[in-house]
């Protein structure tokens, strides 16, 4: 039993938050003791664990199937909470997304059901500014993207002049999310754009103009 808090500020995967883990109502640790899923860096927990076992040093919890099951249950509780917000309290979900979109992307990348539920609201950088995926998807069934930042920097101006919308998928999870969503939605097509390919197409257009 316990309480999970969504932190009101942005956190990083490399930074460990302070928690309170009790074992049979006695303070065991201010670490999460591996109770939280690896992606839940935006969560702080206050938990009392009666059915789990402590290590001999009484500084952490024994890593066994009981701990694994508890971690899975906590992960499901977090996902259920976010799912409920999307369905019933969009304003609150948007507030959490504004602060923790990177972590929400991490959740969606490992859970197809939540990917379908969250994807339209997730922000992606494009050559026309940051847009929700729903906005990108509604513009065209063909989604153009680049895999690395250098390619994106080179193609964004040319693509903009041609009226193309290009997603910068260089950030962690972005390309994975695009590919997984496309596999789940075959009506969508992903088109990886590179500077060389864009210049070739631009050259072909210019050659046709000269020929005419």
Task: Enumerate the predicted regions with their spans.
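Conserved GHKL (Bergerat-fold) ATPase module
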Residues: 1-212
């Amino acid at each position: 039993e316990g309480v999970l808090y969504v932190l009101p500020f942005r956190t990083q995967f490399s930074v460990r938050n302070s928690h309170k883990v009790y074992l049979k109502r006695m303070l065991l640790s201010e670490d999460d003791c591996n109770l939280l899923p690896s992606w839940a860096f935006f969560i702080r927990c206050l938990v009392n664990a009666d059915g789990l076992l402590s290590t001999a040093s009484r500084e952490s919890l024994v890593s066994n199937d009981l701990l694994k099951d508890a971690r899975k249950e906590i992960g499901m509780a977090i996902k259920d909470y976010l799912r409920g917000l999307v369905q019933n309290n969009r304003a609150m979900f948007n507030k959490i997304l504004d602060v923790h979109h990177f972590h929400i992307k991490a959740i969606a990348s490992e859970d197809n059901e939540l990917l379908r539920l969250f994807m339209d609201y997730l922000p992606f950088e494009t050559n026309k500014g940051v847009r929700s995926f729903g906005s990108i998807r509604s513009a065209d069934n063909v989604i153009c993207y680049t895999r690395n930042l250098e390619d994106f920097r080179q193609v964004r101006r040319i693509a903009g002049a041609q009226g193309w919308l290009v997603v910068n998928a260089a950030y962690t999870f972005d390309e994975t999310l695009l590919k997984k969503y496309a596999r789940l939605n075959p009506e969508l097509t992903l088109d990886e754009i590179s500077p060389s390919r864009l210049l070739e197409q631009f050259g072909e257009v210019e050659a046709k103009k000269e020929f005419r």
